[in-house]
Amino acid sequence: MGVVLDSRDMVNFLAQEDIKYVKNYDNYVDGEFVQYSGQLWDYKEITAAINTLLYGKWIVAGEKVAQFQIKFSKRFNVNHSHMVNSGSSANLVLITAMKKKFNWQPDDEVIVSPVGFPTTIAPIVQNGLKPIFIDIELDTLNFDVNLIEGKITSKTKAIFVSPVLGNPPDMDRLVDICNKHNLVLLGDNCDSLGTNWKGNLITDLYYAWTTSFYPAHHISTGEGGMVCSNDEDFINQARSISWWGRDCYCVGSNNLLECGTCGNRFDKWLDDFDGIIDHKYLFTNIGYNLKPLDLQGAIGIEQLAKFDMLESKRREYKNIIQKFIEDNIKGVRVIDASPNSDPSWFGVPIYCETQEIKEKFVAHLEKNKIQTRNYFSGNILLHPGYKHLDDAKKYTNSNLALSNVFFVGCSPLYNQKVLSYIEKVCKKWND
């Protein structure tokens, strides 16, 4: 008689039989498309998602998300983590919660780089604050820390740093500047999860920080993001803002309790109403609905177990691909790790001596099916949605980030077949 499997066992059995990795290059043939990144999932992520749908108690954020938040906090040495539906949402929640907690006023200032992904800057503008731009330096492509103090005014409240593809600026200087001028150091860590500074996680230096779980990032839940801080009150503000602005913080089965997590679910919560209301419908902030699905939390738990392997491969492949490029392509420079840092690389950043070299090298790679990316926006002030914020011409190095810089992947999905093909394409440059 054969073995009889229940439905949960059947899901696990079928997934193990059918899925090694959802995406992989095991059968790669030279000339096939090479993506710059993508999620590395196997049957564990798939079965976690399916089992959460079939047997979980919640569709929206519930017990799996709560478990993921706890495990994530432990892995990245932070007291509190709150999951949202994207890294961009995480940035929006972070800035909105900072404004609320510290009572920032309209036109208060946040220092940022003009080069990077737009949703580092957009939440500042959306909250009625003013981004103060610092031109980049060309060694690391981060904003030039030496220029920051010249831009600080009585309205400056924070520095919001986004390490370039995982590679940070001089963090000691940033901490000193923040301490000297009573500023808050914040991190957009979406591209740099796991980056170290002097042997410790770079995120240890931030008051609050974010990360992204988009498929291209270090771990992926499909879409998703996290807001992190050691300040519980700040995280409570972040949670409220991403949960419609409500005051209630019940999760999972606690939603069903008559007394709720707080013990006073039905009480006199409103100053101007003499009656009992449900705490679940008390709104202390103007908020959004930025909640993830519980299956994303389940996937995140499995991805977190793979993080050390994923990060190690990114570091290894960045160094290998850097050597391929520098050995074969003249007029380009791959960005090295900043002194005192050990980046968790998101990609391989390439600075070209001229715009012509960049355009020809990008065309060469794309023609040979190796995916490239601009360094995101380049100077964001050149773009229609942002050009009103400042004069792009003032930021000459940032303009070079658009004309002379791009990146390729160092994806943990790669294998020796893919790496060998990338080397061949680099060697063909001189044919």
Question: Over which residues does each language-model region extend?
Answer:
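Structural detector of well-ordered beta-strand residues that form the stable sheet scaffold
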Residues: 111, 132, 185-186, 210, ...
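N-terminal "arm"/small-domain region of PLP-dependent enzymes with the aminotransferase-like
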Residues: 1-59, 183, 284, 409
